[in-house]
Structures are given as structure tokens and as C-alpha cells.
Swiss-Prot record:
Glycosylation sites: N103, N125, N298, N746
Coiled-coil region(s): none
A cellular component annotation (GO) from this entry: extracellular matrix
Keyword check for Cell membrane: no
All residue ranges annotated as the Laminin EGF-like domain in the record: 405-497, 498-560, 561-610
Protein name, as recorded: Netrin-B
Species name: Drosophila melanogaster
Role, per record: Netrins control guidance of CNS commissural axons and peripheral motor axons. Its association with either fra or unc-5 receptors will lead to axon attraction or repulsion, respectively. While short-range repulsion requires both fra and unc-5 receptors, long-range repulsion only requires unc-5.
Complex and partners: Binds to unc-5 and fra receptors.
Cysteine-cysteine disulfides: C405-C414, C407-C461, C463-C472, C475-C495, C498-C507, C500-C525, C528-C537, C540-C558, C561-C573, C563-C580, C582-C591, C594-C608, C649-C738, C652-C740, C665-C792
Keywords annotated in UniProt: Cytoplasm, Disulfide bond, Extracellular matrix, Glycoprotein, Laminin EGF-like domain, Repeat, Secreted, Signal
Subcellular location, principal: secreted
Tissue specificity as recorded in UniProt: At 24 hr after puparium formation (APF), detected in the most anterior (oldest) L3, L4 and L5 lamina neurons (at protein level). At 48 hr APF, expressed in all L3, L4 and L5 neurons with slightly higher expression in the L3 neurons (at protein level). At the midline of developing CNS and in different subsets of neurons, muscles, and epidermal patches.
Length: 793
């Protein structure tokens, strides 16, 4: 039993080793998710936060030029503890670092003036631009806001798929979508507008204060469940860069109430009745202490705010261009004609504060940058209003982008590559980045403090399935036998190698040939080497012919024709047989000798001339024992030879030249073939049924079979193996001399014969064969014979 087991293991060991070597040679790991049991299948990279560790460019940073004062905003709308901010502490690096709820890091923008009339004030245009460094297919975008800070009321999210060259709307948020962005709230998405950006009410159907905005890129899109088949949605979720534009802050009702109360003073010409109405409205708004934001999927549109001649009812957005102007120091700059409408209000507000507020000591600054307001005794209502700031800051703690590295289903991972150079991925889209803001996806520079880049970190798909490119978006060189396609659950669309038989290193794809092949093969080889040509480098070029003794991929499969310069009519030969085109009376593979019945001359025009043939010549040649074709060699006396020849030729010429159904049924095969070459047999061919003892008694003709009208259904016979292409036809010498049949080169013939008259692998002309020069009008008759052949008994 042990011996039997050992024997069995000894037999299995070579198989196991062969499988292991084959798997290793193919470069396919057993744990590769892109293959299953050696067959390709769809694979995807891991789902990641694509924003983590990537640089963010901010148009405004709190304390960028000098330390600024900001105050926390309490839930009741009053100002809380005030602090001093600097860029190093509140820079954009905090947006994509590790988000730790117990130690929240924040980016804060520069001061944004609280407008007198938020509905008519120009937008703030504070921007954040995130470069992902590569194309990703995004699932969500999330913005988490800092505690005790105002939330944005209106913002727009844009995406770029070409590294910041162009921008496309992705999502809008606003409490007044129609008025501010000119778009309806929660517009319905159909299959006809799946790439349309939507606007979501930032205060709609929320319960409690929202700490973030979350946008699901596919939610509500009809083709979301069949992403592989929707080119529109594939383009929709693809992005290399994300830009967030903050247009307006949402302020607590209490803060707006104080500003409105100070603004509509007697000096501004307001009436008591209007003030009472406004106060009543503000009191209604003030009943809400918490502010909620809708967490819905969002789409964006490009925002162009170059000039503001006067306040508009809503912002007009251009979906093709995003016009944003930034100063070189990173502060946002908005071009306007005339003064800001809020500037007059601010001067009035400050003068009113000075008139109603008792003198105070300057605030004391205590570490770490906190600003402590001086204590006052029993402040009045007006004095308490003074503690509220007239400016606020956008504050975001986390900028997350969930998605997968875009690899079109041909890679299971993305790998980081480092290339030398400097500059940013968004060099053409400078958003006024501050000098200390990171400018390339380098983790070391992202958190700190240097702008000099000696290397650039990029992500690239580790492509499988014979694909290449950053997103595996094309077939790798020499794998163009089928078109590139995105991998799906049903088909991995693996790229196939071109079939060039080892004679070419380059190929291209031809769609028409691919369709004609039944969508099997479309590769076309070019620059074929080793004297080959053709789509697959499977033919020999002009002046060469294929050596049948060598495989198609052999470097020397094509041999030079070497046609005789005098005996041949050209330098080219048949690419299969190597037969050169010979002049009249010349024979041989290279046309290097005179045929039987011809004699050599000194003329280059007619190197061989025909010798008159008569009975005496035949008798003399027979008596002399001359061999090798021509009129032949006969053992009987001269008279008997002549009589035998006449008898044979008479029978041949007397045979019927008409074809009928009975004759069609009697033969094993019926073909239409064209004679493309000829040569005398160079060796004996002998079988049990077919024997030729002397090589000068047979002629070989190379024919090209064009149509097969009938073949013997019995397997193993020559006719059962017939197919369109080239084949050898054997013709007896006597038939050639009697011109029965009269065979000419480059002519087509209808040939009917029997398998018993030929050696296996050949066709032969025998006593029962029929050879007729083809006429086009016979096509209908042959089709009729084919239909009626079933009745052959």
C-alpha cells in the first residue's frame, strides 16, 4: 500500500511541478484577485479616503498676514470665548490629516464680514481645492465643520477630471436654491440628465445641528445600479480634483437681530412700525437654537463671480467656466464696481458702538493666543450687543472624499511612484495659495512648512489583463488583437496578444477586420521581419516561398525563389510551392532545364524550342531508352508503341465531354479549381491502390480549390478532407501528350474524380475522371445537381 502511494505521488509530482512552473511563467499569483483559476476577472482597488494626506489649497487662511481675532459662536447665538489665530495653527493641512474627534484640528478662513442684507450681498468666494493626484471614482464627499462655528448657508462643489484644466458642477447647498443659484430645490434626476448638478436645501428636514454635509455621488441616479454599462455615470463619478466654494455663511437669528437693530436706527431713517415688524420676525426666528443641515447627495455647477455692479436676485452660474480671482497672498478678491454695500453699514455700526459703549480697557492677550475681553460692570443691552463680532470665519475640521482608484476593473491596487521635479498638480489653476501651503502630494510637505519640492508622489494602477496606462485605460503594446474594454462582472475584457508568428514586434487594431472575424481577432501586424508579410506575417514576401519543412514561427521559414534569370519570366515564385514561372518549353522548380520534347538554344528570349514530334521520333526515343518525360519510354516495339499511343488517345478523346446527373453521382468528388503551377514528379508515389514506378510517367499540377460541389462522406478518404486552398493534382504523362485533358496555367476547371484513382493526400486524373474547362453558366446546373444528389443510389 505504501509502495502504491509512493508510485502515485511519483506520477503526480511532474504534473504539480509543471502546473507550478506554468503559473509562475504566466506571472499569475494564486492569490491575485484579478484572476480566478487562471482566468481573468474583474477586480477593484480598495475603497479609501482619497483625500487623506493630500494637499488642499485655500484661498483664505485665518492669520495668513497677521494674527486675527475670532470668537466662538455659542448655540444661543452669542459670542463665546475669543482667540487669536495664526496660519500655522489653522492652515488647510488640518483638513486631510487624521480626523480625531478627541483632538479636532480645524482650518479657518480669513475674516468674512457679516452682511447687512445677506440676500443681496455679494458671495464670499472662499475656496478649498483638493488635488487627488490621480483619477478616482468617487462615492461620496464629506465636509465636517468645527464646533462652535457658523455653518455655511450656501456652498458649491465642483469637480475636475483633467487635473484642474476644466471644472464641472457637482453639487450645490443653499437655503434659497432658486434665488441664489437659479436652480430648483431637489430637482428630479432622470436618465436624460444624470450628469446634472442638483441644489439641496441646507436646512431642509434636519433634526438637530448638522456637523457635516455629505454628498452621495450616485444617490438618485437611475443608472447607479449598472455603472459598468453607463458611460455617462462613469464620467460623472470620475474626478482628479475637488473644489469647494463657500458663498454665504449661515448666521444665528440672534446675531442678525442685533445687526438689524443697530442698522435700522433713527439715523438710517427707519420707522417704528417697520422695526416692530422686523423684531417680531426676528423673535420667531430666534426660537430655534439649533441649526441643521441636510445630508443628501449633491451636484455642483461652476460659479463665475467676476463683477458685481449691483446686488442680484440670484447668482448667475456658468457651467462651463469657473471664474475666481485670487490675490498672490492667498486672500480672496472680488472685483466690483462701486463700494461694498456693507461698508457704509459697518462705519455706522462702529460709530454707534463708540457712542453707546463706555470706554474700555484694551483686551489682554493670554497664552495660547486667547483674547480676554476686559471686565465691565453691569453692561446694558446695547453694551451686550457690542460683544458680538461684526465678522465671522468659515471653519472646517475634515475634508473627506470616499472612492476607489479608477482602474476600469483591471487592477486590484494602486501603487505610489515618485518622480523627480517640482511644481504642483494644479500649476495652471493657481488659487492664490499662500507661500507655506503645500503644493504637491507629498506627505512631508503637506504638514509643514516647505514649498520646495524635490520629488512628486503619484498613484498609478498596478494593471493586469494585459492593460496599461495610469487608469489601465488602454491595452499594452502588442496586445491589440481585440479592442480595449472596461472589465465587467460578465467579461474581464482581457487584451489579447497579436498573432504575428514571432516575425513582428508591433501591431495595430482594425475594427472592420474584427467585425468580419465574428469579433474574434482584429490585430494587424506590421513591419514583419524574416522576409514575411501579411496580416499575421504568415506569408512570404515577393521573391520568397515558404519552406514546408519548417514551422510558421521559424526565422528561416521563407526561402529565396532563385528563379533562373533566362528560363523564368520573372523573379517571383509561388509562395507555397516555390515554383517559378517558366518560359515556354522550360521546366523545373527554378526553370533551369528544357522540358521533354524541347531542346536548348542560345537565345535568351526562347531558351528552349520544341522538337517536331512524330512516330519515328517516339520509336527512336523508346529504342534508345531515353527517360524523363516528353514522349516517354515504352518497352514494346516501335510499331506497337505507336499503336498503343493512338489507341489510348482515341479512347481519351472519344470519352463524353458532357456532364449529367448520373456522371455527377458516379464520382466521389466534384470541385472547381484553378491551375496555378506545374512540375514533373520528382519522386515515386506508391500505395496499394496506386503505383507509379517511374518518375517520368506523372505530372504534378498545383491547383487552388475554389468551390466544393461534392465530397465523399466516408472519413479517411482524400475527398473527405477537401477544403478551400491549394492541393496537388496528379496527371498521367499519356493524358498530357494526348492533350486529354488539355490543361493550361491560370485556367479554372471543373474536376470530377474518384478517391481510388489517387494516393492519399492527392487528387489524380484517372480513366473515369472528368476535366472540363469551367464556364460561368454552369453554376446553376451544379447547384441543381447538389440538390438532386440526395437521390443518387
Amino acid at each position: 500500500m505504501v509502495r502504491a502511494t509512493g508510485t502515485r505521488m511519483g506520477l503526480l509530482l511532474p504534473i504539480i511541478l509543471a502546473l507550478a512552473i506554468g503559473s509562475s511563467a504566466a506571472g499569475i499569483s494564486s492569490n491575485d484577485p484579478c484572476y480566478f483559476e487562471g482566468k481573468p476577472r474583474k477586480c477593484l482597488p480598495s475603497f479609501v479616503n482619497a483625500a487623506y494626506g493630500n494637499p488642499v489649497q485655500a484661498s483664505s487662511v485665518c492669520g495668513a498676514q497677521q494674527p486675527e481675532r475670532y470668537c466662538e459662536l455659542l448655540r444661543d447665538g452669542n459670542a463665546g470665548e475669543c482667540r487669536s489665530c495664526e496660519q500655522q495653527r489653522y492652515g488647510p493641512a488640518a483638513l486631510t490629516d487624521l480626523n480625531n474627534p478627541s483632538n479636532v484640528t480645524c482650518w479657518r478662513s480669513g475674516a468674512v464680514n457679516v452682511p447687512h442684507d445677506p440676500d443681496s450681498a455679494p458671495p464670499d468666494n472662499v475656496t478649498l481645492t483638493l488635488s487627488l493626484g490621480k483619477k478616482y471614482e468617487l462615492t461620496y464627499i464629506s465636509l465636517s465643520f468645527c464646533p462652535r462655528s457658523p455653518r455655511p448657508d450656501s456652498l458649491a462643489i465642483f469637480k475636475s477630471s483633467d487635473f484642474g484644466q476644466t471644472w464641472q458642477p457637482f453639487q450645490f447647498y443653499s437655503s434659497q436654491c432658486q434665488k441664489f443659484y437659479g436652480r430648483p430645490d431637489r430637482a428630479k434626476i432622470s436618465k436624460f440628465n444624470e450628469q446634472e448638478a442638483r441644489c439641496i436645501n441646507s436646512q431642509h428636514d434636519t433634526g438637530g445641528a448638522a456637523q457635516r454635509f455629505a454628498f452621495n455621488t450616485l444617490e438618485g441616479r437611475p443608472s447607479a445600479n449598472d455603472l459598468d454599462s453607463s458611460l455617462v455615470l462613469q464620467d460623472w463619478v470620475t474626478a482628479t480634483d475637488i473644489r469647494v466654494v463657500f458663498h454665504r455663511l449661515e448666521l444665528p437669528p440672534q446675531l442678525l437681530k442685533v445687526k438689524n437693530a443697530n442698522a435700522f436706527s433713527d439715523e438710517m431713517g427707519g420707522s417704528r412700525e417697520e422695526d416692530e415688524d422686523d423684531d417680531a420676525d426676528l423673535e420667531l426666528d430666534g426660537e430655534q437654537d439649533e441649526y441643521d443641515y441636510n445630508l443628501q447627495d449633491n451636484d455642483s455647477a461652476d460659479a463665475g463671480y467676476d463683477e458685481y455692479e449691483e446686488p442680484k436676485k440670484h447668482l448667475e452660474l456658468d457651467d462651463d467656466h469657473l471664474h475666481l480671482d485670487y490675490a498672490s497672498d492667498g486672500e480672496s478678491v472680488v472685483k466690483r464696481q462701486g463700494k461694498h454695500k456693507g461698508s457704509a453699514y459697518e462705519k455706522h455700526y462702529q460709530s454707534k458702538l463708540a457712542a453707546t459703549t463706555p470706554p474700555q480697557q484694551p483686551p489682554k492677550v493670554t497664552p495660547p493666543g486667547k483674547v480676554t475681553p476686559p471686565s465691565t460692570a453691569a453692561p446694558s443691552a446695547a453694551a451686550s450687543a457690542v460683544t458680538l463680532p461684526i465678522s465671522q470665519h468659515y471653519a472646517v475640521s475634515d475634508f473627506a472624499v470616499g472612492g476607489r482608484c479608477k482602474c476600469n476593473g483591471h487592477a486590484s491596487e494602486c501603487v505610489a511612484t515618485v518622480s523627480s521635479g517640482s511644481g504642483t498638480a494644479l500649476s495652471d489653476q493657481d488659487d492664490g495659495q499662500d507661500e507655506d501651503t503645500p503644493s504637491a502630494p507629498s506627505l512631508a510637505n503637506h504638514f509643514g512648512r516647505s514649498t520646495q519640492m524635490s520629488a512628486k508622489l503619484t498613484m498609478t494602477c498596478a494593471c493586469k489583463h494585459n492593460t496599461a496606462g495610469p487608469e489601465c485605460e488602454r491595452c499594452k503594446p502588442f496586445y491589440f488583437d481585440r479592442p480595449w474594454g472596461r472589465a465587467t462582472d460578465n467579461d474581464a475584457n482581457e487584451c489579447k496578444m497579436c498573432q504575428c508568428n514571432g516575425h513582428a514586434r508591433r501591431c495595430r487594431f482594425n475594427l472592420e477586420l474584427y467585425k468580419l472575424s465574428g469579433r474574434v481577432s482584429g490585430g494587424v501586424c506590421y513591419n514583419c521581419q524574416h522576409d514575411t508579410t501579411g496580416r499575421y506575417c504568415h506569408y512570404c514576401r515577393e521573391g520568397y516561398y515558404r519552406d514546408a519543412t519548417k514551422p510558421p514561427n521559424h526565422r528561416k521559414v521563407c526561402k529565396r525563389c532563385d528563379c533562373h534569370p533566362v528560363g523564368s519570366t520573372g523573379k517571383t515564385c509561388n509562395h507555397l510551392s516555390g515554383q517559378c514561372p517558366c518560359k515556354e518549353g522550360v521546366t523545373g522548380l527554378t526553370c533551369n532545364r528544357c522540358a521533354r520534347g524541347y531542346q536548348q538554344t542560345r537565345s535568351h528570349v526562347a531558351p528552349c524550342i520544341k522538337v517536331p514530334t512524330n512516330a519515328n521520333m517516339i520509336q527512336a526515343e523508346s529504342a534508345g531508352g531515353g527517360g524523363g518525360g516528353g514522349t516517354g519510354d515504352y518497352k514494346d516495339g516501335g510499331g506497337s508503341q505507336v499503336e498503343e499511343m493512338k489507341k489510348y488517345c482515341g479512347k481519351c478523346k472519344a470519352s463524353p465531354k458532357k456532364l449529367n446527373l448520373n456522371k455527377f453521382c458516379m464520382e466521389d468528388y466534384a470541385i472547381l479549381a484553378k491551375v496555378i503551377g506545374h512540375d514533373r514528379a520528382s519522386q515515386d508515389i506508391s500505395t496499394e491502390k496506386f503505383s507509379i514506378e517511374r518518375q517520368n510517367e506523372i505530372y504534378k499540377y498545383e491547383i487552388n480549390i475554389q468551390t466544393i460541389f461534392k465530397r465523399n462522406p466516408m472519413s479517411g478518404t482524400t475527398s473527405s478532407l477537401l477544403g478551400r486552398g491549394n492541393m496537388m493534382l496528379l496527371v498521367p504523362r499519356k493524358s498530357i501528350e494526348c492533350q486529354c485533358p488539355k490543361i493550361k496555367l491560370n485556367k479554372s476547371y471543373l474536376i470530377l474524380g474518384r478517391d481510388s484513382e489517387a494516393a492519399p493526400g492527392y487528387l489524380a486524373i484517372g480513366p473515369s475522371s472528368v476535366v472540363l474547362e469551367w464556364k460561368d453558366e454552369w453554376s446553376l446546373r451544379m447547384k441543381r445537381f447538389q440538390r438532386r444528389a440526395r437521390k443518387c443510389s
